[in-house]
Amino acid sequence: MARSRSRSPRWKQRSLSPQSRNFEYHEERHFHGHYDPEYRHDQQRPFTWRMDDEKHGQNKPRIPPRVNSYHRSYVNRSPSPNVKPVEKFDTYKPHQEYFPGRGDDDRRSQYMPTYTESAATYMEHERDCYIPTVQGRYTPDDHRGRGRGSGRGEKPPQMSLGKPPKMSLGKPPQMSLADSLRFKEKWHEDELRHQRVQEESYPQSPRRGSEDFGTRNPFQKRYPEDHDFRKYGYTSKRPTDAARYENRDPARIPKWKPEHSFLPFQEKKEEWSFGAQGHRYTEREYPERSSTTRVSYDYRHKHHKLSESEQDFPDGRFHKHLKEEDRKYSSIKAPANRELDCFSTTRGREIENEQINGPFYLYNKNSVSYNHTNIKDADLEPCNDKWKKKISKEDCRKENASFSKQFDTSPKPEEKCYSLIKKKPLSVKVDRNKTDTFRSTSRYSAERQISHDLVAIGKTSDNFHPVFQHLDSTQNPENKPTEEFAQEIITLIHKVKADSFVTPDITLNERFSRIKNRQDADFNQTKSNSDPEFHRRIDMSLDDFQNKYTMVYEPDKTLVKVIEPNDLRHDIERRRKERLQNEDENIFHMASPTERNHQSPSFSKVKTIRADGFQKPPHFIKSNFRKFIQKPYINYTMQRKDAIDQKIFRVEENHQNRRGSKGSFKNFLGGRFQPHYKSHLVQKSMYIQAKYQRLRFAGPRGFITNKFRNRFLRKKKEYPVLPRTNNLELLQVEPTLYEDLTEHLIFVRNWN
């Protein structure tokens, strides 16, 4: 199908439907648009249409004339004048409207992917609906002449008053006034009927919503200097509603009323005779039309009266955009309620006032949720002050008159506006005295709490503490204070306790005294080998604790002093000692648990006498002998220059800190210092045995080094017999010898 070849950057058609336009659509829209035959045959505006077109900025030099290119694309494509659009209105899709700012088909094809979601749904209703020879955006020649050639200031030669429609190549047929009226009546009726059919199939319109407009608006990106495109470009859902409600703002603004009074429908005929409003007489001369038809036709002129949108949009695009407005207003389409579109034609005629005033009321409630221009207009600033910044005063007068024109279809527009103004303060005014009972104290700020306290000062009661006055005054000053409620709770608790829980006659002191006396009486009868789990004295006095009993604890008849075995405080310690004893039995020797804790003052002097005459160190731990040859007394060589008496005690301290009880036997045996308790012969023999034993177990992990080995061998050769104690070398070798002797003695005793 042929498409328009217009290459103007400002004239790019874009439609919501994937199907191209054909002539029947434009023919019917032509007879229903601004510059239809009714408008040109109007006797009251023979010359004002040129002024109006020039005023709307269509003759701007930045809009190049396109008369020749347009007619060249539609040569030999004019349809027959006998074709009537009513025959195929059952398949007409009301969503096929032209959006101003969309451009020709070449631009529409450029942005077609944005409508892929709605393409399949519209194909079945749009295919084979119109004559396929002329497709795309086609506007009658007189539209083109005004919209392109010389700023719509030249009246097309094809139209003259009283003449029948005339056909020429590349130009649409022009019909008489009666035919135009008949076409418009049928068009409105069928349009509403098909809109109902389509919206029943698609209760929510698949068109782009307002959320898509901000990110998918190519005109804002391509022509950022045209600020009006943000409001009216592409007529997406949001800008269309913004423009629609913006035009009604002066009806609700009190400052607008003295300048633009909204007269009844018949009284405004003389006012419209002026040049700025002359092109809207067509509708007013046919009041016999149905209310729904008037509603659709009224809102068709909405964008035409705004010069800031007409300055940037040619006539043809504005023509198609008004069809979108008819479809919206015929079904009372609010921006947030698209699902309410399913209105029948009969219902639309019955509720004419609702169709006209419904959007006003919705805007009064939801003015904040709409476009930002609505918020600015609702700020009690006259709309003409804002528009005077962009257009002349003549345009403002035309727009103001067109505002009043929209209200003419309602019976009493002044009463509607005043009723809305009276309702508005009710939504703003708040009765704080009533809302106090529904809000908690935590929701109020400090200032609001103070204000409520001041108001409720006279209502406060005197039966509660002043601390709670601030909290209770905001909610209910007559309520009982918090402390009284707490006191009642406490009283109930005491009452229940006195009734249900009888206190015993015996005190705690008496009860524990009885237990103590009974245990003291039975203490002598307690067996020594009784189970501690059943016979434990948990209330042992200090005297009993200090009283120690002697008993046979080990099978080898080792006499130890122990405390009462049934005492719970010593049970854990006793078990720990037994566990350590069992571990030692697996190694070499079984020792008494008291022998391990030699540091205890109670057991420091306990001794066991062996048959060989040697005293057994009570604090000696019997463990693996190899542990004693792994890096033992390395500090002996570091302290050889010290005095012997100081060195012995220092070595004792270092070894007790480093190895625990492993080296504690060297200098203290049985709690007393005994360095020379053996004879000289015994010491020599033990030294030799310890030396060879050390050399036997010396290895890479041992404590013996070559230095010590060489020294010991040299000392052995030079001194076959130990020298006297006054020899200086003896003082140097004595720590090592004493260490060797002690280790040898330990080894011998363990070996036996």
Curated annotation (Swiss-Prot):
Positions of post-translational Phosphoserine modification: S15, S17, S78, S80, S205, S592
Basic residues bias: start-end ranges: 1-13
Biased composition range(s): Basic and acidic residues: 23-57, 85-109, 190-199, 222-231, 238-252
InterPro entries assigned to the protein according to its UniProt record, in alphabetical order: THRAP3_BCLAF1 (IPR029199)
Pfam family, one: THRAP3_BCLAF1
Region of interest: Disordered: 1-114, 132-177, 190-252
Subcellular location(s) per record: Mitochondrion
Protein keywords: Isopeptide bond, Mitochondrion, Phosphoprotein, Ubl conjugation
GO cellular component: mitochondrion
Site of covalent link Glycyl lysine isopeptide (Lys-Gly) (interchain with G-Cter in SUMO2): K416
Family: Belongs to the BCLAF1/THRAP3 family.
Protein name per UniProt: BCLAF1 and THRAP3 family member 3
Naturally occurring in which organism (per UniProt): Mus musculus (Mouse)
Taxonomic lineage from the root: Eukaryota, Metazoa, Chordata, Craniata, Vertebrata
Gene behind this protein: Bclaf3
